[in-house]
Amino acid sequence: MTTLKNDRYLKALLREPVDMTPVWMMRQAGRYLPEYKATRAEAGDFMSLCRNADLACEVTLQPLRRYELDAAILFSDILTIPDAMGLGLTFGAGEGPKFDRPIETKSAVENLPIPDPEQELQYVMNAVRTIRRELNGEVPLIGFSGSPWTLATYMVEGGSTKAFTKIKKMMYAEPKLLHKLLDKVADSVVLYLNAQIKAGAQAVMIFDTWGGVLGHREYLDFSLQYMHKIVNGLIRENDGRKVPVTLFTKGGGLWLDAIADTGCDAIGLDWTVNLAQAKAQVGHKVALQGNMDPSVLYAAPERIEQEVRSILADFGEGSGHVFNLGHGIHQDVPVESPKVFVDAIHQYSKPYHK
């Protein structure tokens, strides 16, 4: 087993005792950091940054040099899998992702390959291995993937969307076709995350960014069912240590019981959920991650500290809480604000862990 100098993140995910509440931030390696912008400029474009193991490692480590974070998260993108399937991913300057060859027909679904993670996605595994080496046991490394539903929205829509008309048209008019697509993507995610774990990821997270746009039955059938399949297929122990799995559906507060029943170790919460209620509902089954509104980081230090203390009080005593934002950090927050956030969590959480 690799020795970890700080394992409180992994312990909290498994609801084991910790000395203080661990914290990391979604998108902690990103555009709010001037050093990230410099490294991205050096890479040339976003996907070149992802594909260069040394530069991906550098941006993964940047936030850890500034803030006392309890975990590192692999720098990559959720759209690596559809890109490896041959859909032709591009990021225009100042624009969101676009696919040159979106999924529009039955034959497109049938001909979709399942990528070999150590071939088409080897650059991701190289990044994981490089980051693990450079972390040198300081904190654990989180691997991740998008959820099948969320990946399928981009694959069918051809990029970002606010209306979700194409994917929902397929869902209601051709449900069998969408299930076939989701099944293929789920199989790909299992292979991808297991390869990350073998390469050195010590925990994994599935980002279901768009699950919250679905109705109740549709969420269970078209999103959660496939995350459940992934959870069942994952390596749950590696290098003599359990590998915790976190599921995060943005807008998923209505489905906490169903998410907990997948057998995941933790549920990520957005800021619309009350942490005390979530703990009362599912805290006996899973750990909880979250859930400060990222926009609080625009506020004065005292207001950030106040929000941290409120959320800590909502969770109350005991382990099983990983502090995080309710979604990714905004790109224009002051770089001093995350330090206030992280330090406040460590300072004010200690009494809850006696």
UniProtKB/Swiss-Prot annotation:
PANTHER family: METHYLTETRAHYDROFOLATE:HOMOCYSTEINE METHYLTRANSFERASE RELATED (PTHR21091), UROPORPHYRINOGEN DECARBOXYLASE (PTHR21091:SF169). Keywords: Cytoplasm, Decarboxylase, Lyase, Porphyrin biosynthesis. PROSITE patterns: UROD_1, UROD_2. It is found in: Cytoplasm. GO terms for biological process: protoporphyrinogen IX biosynthetic process from glutamate. Belongs to the uroporphyrinogen decarboxylase family. Pfam families: URO-D. It catalyses: uroporphyrinogen III + 4 H(+) = coproporphyrinogen III + 4 CO2. Homodimer. The record marks D77 as: Transition state stabilizer. Substrate binds at R27, Q28, A29, G30, R31, D77, Y154, T209, H327. This is Uroporphyrinogen decarboxylase. GO terms for molecular function: uroporphyrinogen decarboxylase activity.
